[in-house]
Swiss-Prot record:
The keyword Oxidoreductase applies. GO terms for biological process: tricarboxylic acid cycle. Its EC number is 1.1.5.4. Pathway: Carbohydrate metabolism; tricarboxylic acid cycle; oxaloacetate from (S)-malate (quinone route): step 1/1. GO terms for molecular function: 2-hydroxyglutarate dehydrogenase activity; L-malate dehydrogenase (quinone) activity. SUPFAM superfamilies: FAD/NAD(P)-binding domain. This is Probable malate:quinone oxidoreductase. NCBIfam families: mal_quin_oxido, PRK05257.1-1, PRK05257.1-3, PRK05257.1-4, PRK05257.2-1, PRK05257.2-4, PRK05257.3-1, PRK05257.3-2. The lineage of its organism: Bacteria, Bacillati, Bacillota, Bacilli, Bacillales.
Length: 500
């Protein structure tokens, strides 16, 4: 089949949560469109979406302190927290639609109810958390949140963390029962199983080597079939690059103006995993702390109950590492290969600006097991070294670009869509909040790339995602109704309390 041209409507590159979500949306909105998926690895959801390669938090800003910043007057800016929460609600609604429509089954295999908690130490941090709690409590999306700085309450909420604690330093926590643990690997595999039934062509062990524009305005994707060794050429009207850290090099190959002056900085993550089941059973929450002064946002420490392979697990981290690879299964030449004449100055400017991050990563890489245990003991004073192993999580490629606010070579910490002016190709770059906001981000892809179709699609989108285009903050009754109905469908309600 070498050099044979094969035409299709849509090509999705990468079999992760983003392509799975976009493919599922398109199959509901335009069922007649032909879709092909190309994935370098042997199965779906094996890179960033894999359950061991991300924190599995349903990011809705219930406990993540980096989404609420303190202003100079001491008040709390909750804008980003509200935005992230609203975006997660879209994911929750779409997943509930898929379950209710019997397109995917057994929601407990990918989402579980789990309290989300924030925990801080020190007088100043306690005051910050109280102010945060008061600011968020006024918003309907965060109702049901509790605050306590009483040691007896904290012992009830956090028995493992409070046991053996000798310091008299003030502590406080917030707790909300409507949090979730999401197994994005399992969800990705379910979505691709569904897409297979809709005649989506899934090609595993197929590596995309090049993407170029044809004379008639289509995109030609050069694919290496790693099973047969043959080279294939596929053309499509629309291409989505959802290859995690591998998206940037592929975007650069397209040559679109929007791909210029963008760089990527890879950061690897490590987690400690508890192998003593007795310890695992003593904790039931995702508990997020506060990043240390000067540390980057991705360094927020958290102690998480996880549900992986139908078993309860306990993970602590993340610890950062450095590897020049853009994917866990990538090449050591990824970083240097991504430096181009059009982004070299952007990359160099970031290098000068981000000396603090570089120093932080070097320190993290040098940590011994015992040094990591010392950080864990700030959460679990009685933690024993022999009970904990280290696991290497996924690679995250932080976007570097020139911005008006930050100037040349500014490091970005979010998720962003880069698309051609004519909407014929789009790529997803960046890291957190990532998978949790997959539905919002893929709706953004549809809006950018298929603007002429949005009016015709709107009714179906609202059937799948009722709050699409609506602020739930401004419609508390709708939020209440949707939260209850999606919770019932996804099997979350028995542990959740959302107050009127």
């Amino acid at each position: 089949m070498s050099n044979m041209q094969q035409k299709t409507d849509v090509i999705l590159i990468g079999a992760g949560i983003m392509s799975a979500t976009l493919g599922s949306l398109l199959k509901e909105l335009a069922p007649e469109w032909e879709i092909k998926v190309f994935e370098k690895l042997a199965s779906a959801g094996e890179e960033s979406s894999n359950e061991w390669n991300n924190a599995g938090t349903g990011h809705s800003a219930l406990c993540e302190l980096n989404y609420t910043s303190e202003k100079s007057d001491g008040s709390i800016d909750i804008g980003k927290a509200v935005k992230v929460n609203e975006q997660f609600q879209l994911s929750r609604q779409f997943w509930a639609y898929l379950v209710k429509s019997k397109l995917i089954r057994n929601p407990q295999d990918f989402i579980m109810p789990l309290p989300h908690m924030s925990l801080v130490q020190g007088e100043k941090n306690v005051e910050f958390l109280k102010n945060r709690f008061e600011a968020l409590s006024k918003n309907p999306l965060f109702q049901g949140m509790e605050f306590s700085d009483a040691p007896e309450t904290l012992k009830k909420w956090l028995p493992l963390i409070m046991e053996g604690r000798t310091s008299n330093e003030p502590m406080a926590a917030t707790k909300i029962d409507s949090g979730t643990d999401v197994n994005f690997g399992a969800l990705t595999r379910m979505l691709f199983d569904y897409l297979k039934t809709k005649n989506v062509e899934l090609n595993y062990k197929h590596s995309v080597e090049n993407i170029k524009r044809t004379k008639n305005g289509l995109w030609e994707v050069k694919v290496h079939d790693m099973n047969s060794g043959k080279i294939e050429h596929h053309t499509a009207k629309f291409v989505f690059i959802g290859g995690g850290g591998g998206s940037l090099p592929l975007l650069q190959k397209t040559g679109i103006p929007e791909s210029k002056h963008i760089g990527g900085f890879p950061v690897s993550g490590l987690f400690m995993v508890c192998k003593n089941q007795k310890v695992v059973e003593q904790h039931h929450a995702k508990v997020y702390g506060k990043a240390k002064v000067g540390a980057p946002p991705m360094s927020v420490p958290h102690l998480d109950t996880r549900y992986i392979d139908n078993k309860k697990a306990l993970l602590f981290g993340p610890f950062a590492g450095f590897s020049p690879k853009f994917l866990k299964t990538g090449s050591n030449l990824d970083l240097i290969g991504s430096v181009k004449p059009n982004n070299v100055l952007t990359m160099l400017a970031a290098g000068v600006k981000e000396m603090g991050l570089t120093k932080y990563l070097i320190q993290q890489v040098m940590l011994s097991h015992e040094k990591r245990m010392e950080e864990l003991r700030e959460f679990i004073p009685n933690a024993k070294s022999e009970d904990w192993d280290i696991v290497v999580a996924g690679q995250r490629v932080q976007v570097i670009k020139d911005t008006d606010a930050g100037g040349k070579g500014t490091l970005q910490f979010g998720t962003e869509v880069v698309s051609a002016a004519d909407g014929s190709i789009a790529a997803l770059l960046g890291a957190s909040p990532g998978a949790s906001t997959a539905v919002h981000v893929m709706l953004e892809v549809l809006e950018k790339c298929f603007p002429s179709r949005m009016v015709e699609w709107e009714e179906k989108i609202k059937e799948m995602i009722p709050s699409y285009g609506i602020s739930l903050t401004e419609n508390p009754r709708l939020f209440q109704d949707l939260h209850t109905s999606t919770g019932r469908t996804l099997g979350l309600n028995e542990k959740e309390t959302v107050h009127n």
